[in-house]
Each structure stands twice: as C-alpha cells, then as structure tokens.
A protein has these predicted regions:
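Short, low-complexity N-terminal leaders and the immediately following helix N-cap/first helix
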Residues: 1-66, 309, 314-342
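Short beta-strand/loop turn elements enriched in aromatics
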Residues: 25-26, 44-66, 101-113, 314, ...
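Solvent-exposed alpha-helices and their adjacent loops that cap or buttress functional pockets
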Residues: 48-50, 59-60, 78-82, 95-96, ...
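Short, glycine/charged-enriched hinge/interface segments at domain edges or termini
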Residues: 56-214, 376
C-alpha cells in the first residue's frame, strides 16, 4: 500500500484544476482564489512620509532648531526646510524637502518656537522612503493566492476595485448506507444518524471558494448509486463520498465508479483511513472516504481538503495542511503498527516547548475523540516513539 505522504503527493498532483474565471468587486473577493497575478500600480509608500508624530529637522549638527510650520497627513503643500529649521509633523505626512530626520515627539523639548532634542538624531530615522515596501511594477499578489483580509487590504492600497478570481469549485457530498438516517428522522432498530455528511459539509462551509451541493444519503443499491453519481458528475467539479468504499458485499461505490469512470488509487497505509481512494467520472474528480466517522474526518482534513484547494486554484504548497513540531509527552515502545497512524491528541505548552499527548478514545468510530482533540499526531509505521521525541502534528 502507498504511504500517506506518497498518496498525498499523488492525489494533489492529479487534481484537475478549475480554469473558469470571473471578475468580482473587491468587497466580494474575500476568501476567493486569485486567477491572475496583480501588479503594483505605484510605489509603496507612494512618497516619503513620517513614520510617527514628531518633528522634521534639517541639520543633524544643530543642537536647536527653529520651528516654521506644521505638516499633517493629507497636506498637499510642498514644504521645505532650511538648515537649522524644524517642522511639526504627524504620522503619514509628506516629508518636507531637505529633511534629515524625524525626531519622535517623546524625545523633544519645545520652548516657544525653539526645538531641542533629548537624544542624538540619526540620519533618515523615522522616515518611510518612497518604494521601500514595493516598487511600481512589482508583483503584488500572485495567481493562486487565497484572498484573505491582508490580501484584500494590499489590493485596496494599490487602488484595485475589482479582481479576477477562479469560479467557485462545485463539490457534491454524499454518504452511503441503508443504516443511515438524517437527524430529523425517527431511528428504527439498527439505524444510526448520519454524522459524516453534516461533518463534511461543515468543513467545506469555511471555504468561500467552494460551492457546496448536499447530495444526501445514498442507499446500498448499485443502480441508484450509479445513476446518482452519473448525474452529479455533470454538475460538479468534485464528488466526495463517505462510506461504501471498503471490501464488503454492500460496499457498492467502487463498482459504481468503475462503471462510470475509473479508480486511480485505493487504499493507503494509514490508520484511520485505510480505504481512502480517488478516481474520476469524465472531468469530475471523485474521492472515496471511509465510512467510520473519525477515519472520514482525518482523511478529509489531511487529503480531501488539500486536493479540493488545489483543484480550486491554489498552489500545491499552499494547499498542504498546516503542521508543526511538538515533543511527545508519551512513548510507544515497541511500535508494531504497520501503518502510519494519526492519533488524536491534546497540546500543551511548557518551558521546554510544545508537548502532545494522545487521548484515550482512539477508535475510528469515536467522534468524541476528535471533538476533544487539538491535533493529529503523526506516528510513523513500526517506529518506536520515545518520551521527548519531536513529532509532526496537524492542528484540527
């Protein structure tokens, strides 16, 4: 079986990227993915300006300066200083001609129209120089960038009122199983409420660049599954199916997908989540998630969501799930697990750095363990874990 990281790379490399674009107003672009790099239209800052409230001075060799005027933000006058002169200046105001430095207000003393300084002024201090952040023509935001609040602000600072973004990725979500019922139904004997589909839909709702299609619950009927997936593929860029992808006689998603298209890979050497797979129906990408709730959650967070982000236009490196290092506050000796395991755990910060410890409830059906967990702890297969060893963890 393919290892997790091999599978993740293959899945993302094979993602069918959306090509359709649209232009949206800047105030509606938050959370979308940029489809065309944008270029700085002007230097930033556009002019030399003061970094703080204080006094602009001319003459670093002076011990006192004579005050002549005041420069405020938005003042359009061309102001000039002569040697031995100073000017009251406010943050963001244009720097007067011949200014050597701006002295912060806290380091000055004013008596009448005479300014003195309690510290030695340094050339160019507290002056923001034109173009020190960006030069006109520099790349402001690259194609594939997620338009978060910072990116929106940066685009606005250069006068952009509209941006070209990728159209929303249409994603259909299904669960399968005769035992599943929706939350508004009365449970019969041996039935359970469908938790996977609401969970997956909730994961997707945080992504503005995805248009969610709730496909509902599919029965364990090959004809119905095949017909439903065939229709969904004509209206979706991607399909997510939880359940029905294992090896049982009632696991009918695989044969349905084989009839309609192809299965490109099935099974990864991970726990939970071994039955994870992917394929396609025409141009529509299909991901097969395990039916056990924790396995479905883990594979969707670590594999499904990165694949969808890549398909939606993000760069692969940006789409990869966030991870960092933390010390093991536990040990596994010996570790006989033949698959890479992602334990649900909690994080604590100590004087020795961040530490992680697994929760007690690790069953792939125990969703409460995910609710109480802060991270997924990456445990390599057949590798002993020592107390204090650095491990990779994924926040959830």
């Amino acid at each position: 079986m393919m290892d997790f990281y091999q599978g993740q790379e293959a899945l993302l490399q094979q993602a069918s990227r959306i090509v359709e674009t649209e232009t949206v107003p800047l105030n509606q672009a938050a959370g979308r993915i940029l489809a065309q790099s944008i270029i700085a239209t002007t230097d930033s800052p556009a002019f030399d300006n003061s970094a703080m409230d204080g006094y602009a001075i001319c003459g670093l060799d002076c011990s006192e300066w004579q005050l002549t005027d005041t420069a405020a933000a938005g003042d359009t006058r061309l102001l000039t200083l002569q040697h031995g002169q100073a000017m009251r200046i406010y943050t963001g105001a244009g720097i007067p001609v011949n200014t050597d430095a701006v002295i912060m207000q806290e380091n000055t003393c004013v008596e009448g129209l005479t300014l003195s300084c309690t510290s030695t002024p340094v050339a160019n201090e507290n002056i923001r120089r034109q173009g020190e952040e960006l030069k006109q023509g520099a790349t402001l935001l690259e194609k594939g960038a997620l338009l978060n609040a910072q990116a929106i602000g940066l685009a606005a600072s250069q006068g952009f009122s509209k941006l070209q973004v990728y159209q929303k990725l249409r994603v259909s979500v299904f669960t399968t199983g005769d035992e599943l019922v929706s939350g508004n139904s009365q449970l019969q004997q041996h039935q359970i409420y469908d938790s996977n589909r609401p969970m997956l839909l909730a994961c997707l709702q945080t992504y503005t660049f995805i248009e969610i299609i709730d496909g509902g619950i599919l029965p364990d009927n090959l004809d119905i599954i095949t017909e439903t997936l065939s229709k969904a593929a004509t209206n979706s860029h991607s399909i997510i199916i939880s359940g029905g992808a294992s090896v049982g006689d009632r696991d009918l998603v695989k044969p349905a997908l084989q009839q309609l298209g192809s299965i490109e890979h099935w099974k990864l050497a991970i726990k939970p989540g071994k039955p994870f797979g992917w394929g396609s129906i025409g141009e529509c990408r299909v991901m097969l998630l395990p039916g056990n709730p924790v396995a479905s959650f883990v594979t969707f967070k670590l594999l499904g969501l990165p694949a969808l982000q890549t398909a939606a236009g993000r760069h692969i490196l940006q789409a990869l799930p966030e991870c960092y290092q933390a010390k093991a506050a536990f040990s596994i000796i010996p570790n006989r697990q033949k698959r890479r395991e992602f334990l649900r755990g909690t994080l604590r910060f100590t004087n020795n750095g961040p530490e992680v410890i697994p929760l007690n409830k690790q069953g792939s059906h125990m969703l409460s363990g995910c609710v109480n967990a802060q991270v997924l702890i990456d445990i390599p297969a057949q590798t002993d874990i020592q107390q204090g060893q650095w491990l990779t963890v994924y926040p959830i």
